[in-house]
């Protein structure tokens, strides 16, 4: 890689690191190509980026971004996982991926500007994702309206049942 290519990579990484809400550093030791491809596919489906980065280029790209606070962790084989929307989804996907693989470990992360260790990522993985939270909020907002409709409809339903019972009673008498 010549100097111009390196500068392009650094510039591109710098922009992505600056935009990322979550940047997770992982150590992908002992993974075969098929396993890494499967992980990349799952992450891509969730709109999460997975890159194997050259440490010196990544450390230079991190300058002036929140990732700079963990730049000293760019040592040895390093995978950089970045999410630009949701901070929980990449943590969940990586935690799930790590269950079956002893060699794949999370070193550290920067989540919305805060440094988080591997245990913090595991805790974050147990939280509901952004879509789940939106669903829960929508359900909480809709619940009072549903209950109000049920309460307002109850007298009418009761009246209909009373009238129906009275009709049956009159039909039996005739």
Swiss-Prot record:
BP-aspect Gene Ontology terms: translation
Superkingdom as given in the UniProt entry: Bacteria
A Gene Ontology term for the protein's cellular component: ribonucleoprotein complex
Pfam family, any one: Ribosomal_L10
Ribosomal protein listed as a keyword: yes
InterPro entries cross-referenced by the UniProt entry: Ribosomal_uL10, Ribosomal_uL10-like_sf, Ribosomal_uL10_bac, Ribosomal_uL10_bac_type
Keywords: Ribonucleoprotein, Ribosomal protein, RNA-binding, rRNA-binding
Record flagged with keyword rRNA-binding: yes
UniProt-recorded Gene Ontology molecular function terms: large ribosomal subunit rRNA binding
CDD domains reported for this sequence: Ribosomal_L10
PANTHER family noted in UniProt: 39S RIBOSOMAL PROTEIN L10, MITOCHONDRIAL
Cited function: Forms part of the ribosomal stalk, playing a central role in the interaction of the ribosome with GTP-bound translation factors.
Subunit and partners: Part of the ribosomal stalk of the 50S ribosomal subunit. The N-terminus interacts with L11 and the large rRNA to form the base of the stalk. The C-terminus forms an elongated spine to which L12 dimers bind in a sequential fashion forming a multimeric L10(L12)X complex.
Sequence similarity: Belongs to the universal ribosomal protein uL10 family.
Name used for this protein in its record: Large ribosomal subunit protein uL10
Upper lineage: Bacteria, Pseudomonadati, Myxococcota, Myxococcia, Myxococcales
């Amino acid at each position: 890689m010549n100097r111009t290519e390196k500068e392009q990579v650094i510039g591109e990484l710098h922009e992505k690191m600056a935009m990322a809400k979550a940047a997770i550093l992982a150590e992908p030791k002992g993974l075969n190509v098929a396993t890494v491809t499967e992980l990349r596919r799952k992450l891509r489906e969730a709109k999460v980026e997975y890159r194997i980065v050259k440490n010196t280029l990544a450390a230079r790209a991190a300058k002036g971004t929140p990732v700079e606070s963990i730049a000293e962790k760019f040592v040895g084989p390093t995978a950089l996982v970045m999410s630009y929307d949701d901070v929980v989804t990449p943590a969940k996907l990586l935690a799930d991926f790590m269950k079956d693989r002893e060699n794949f470990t999370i070193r550290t992360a920067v989540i919305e500007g805060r440094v988080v260790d591997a245990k913090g990522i595991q805790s974050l993985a147990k939280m509901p994702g952004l879509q789940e939270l939106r669903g829960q909020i929508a359900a909480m907002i809709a619940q009072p309206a549903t209950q109000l409709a049920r309460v307002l409809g109850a007298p009418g339903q009761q009246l209909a049942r009373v009238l129906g019972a009275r009709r049956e009673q009159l039909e039996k008498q005739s």
